[in-house]
Amino acid sequence: MRAGRLKVRRYKTRRHSPVWPILLGLLALGCAAFWLLRDTDAGAFLRFTPALSPQDRAAETRTLVLPGKTWYALQLGVFEDTASAGDLAESFRLRGAAGYIARREHYRVLAAAYPTRADAQAVQTQLRTQHQVDAYIYEIPRPEITLRLTGQRAQLTALSDAYDALDQAAEQLFALSQAIDQGKEQDYRAALTSTRETATALRGRLAALFDAPPQAVQQVMDLLQALADGLEQAANAQSAVRLGAQIKYCQLLCAVGMADYAAALAP
């Protein structure tokens, strides 16, 4: 059988407050949705792969929870057009900021992502007093999503691993960014290579398990590919400033990407 389109059933639940973070977070909205595939829909999700063991080919139903998460971003500017946003983003990349452009109602240029508002406020103050740069704290919320999926064991495991890897990458890249900004000695490129190889391997697993990936799976594959590409650019950076900027960019890529992914499935 070939992989088809996933069917989504959403249920309303309570909502939390949202978030996401040169040297700077992300989103959180906290609602919960349920993505349900009935047993009769299993064939739409499954593709039997001869290379898999009988256990991995077996159909099962599993509940996956994508937890809510809020990052706090320092926003440098908001624009109606991409050209203006791009110009500002590049000017700040040269100074070590991510220069990440989030397409949210308008084009928002973000400098970095922080796990707490206090962290973002500390850098916001530093930018204003030491560099005469005004930045706005922009919250990017990610809703909590509960997914009840039916598919091959190998498919469900690969998807769960991809969710975990993208969240872990955002946290690890934040830690790397902080270390670089503080001038700590560390083997940055080894860490970047490890994360890039993980993203590439997970994308390959998902591609091998789905003939025609459902949209929800394809979005994860695209995000993993974008992360791998971004990390390769970071590894090839020719200066510490460019390295720090690209690491912040990749962190925001994960944080914003997963927030948008969860929000699309929320009720």
Ranges and model annotations:
Residues 19-39:
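Hydrophobic membrane-insertion alpha-helices, especially the h-region
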Residues 35-38, 69-78, 176, 207:
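Short charge-dense sequence patches
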Residues 211-267:
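Extracytoplasmic/luminal low-complexity segments enriched in Pro/Gly and acidic/polar residues
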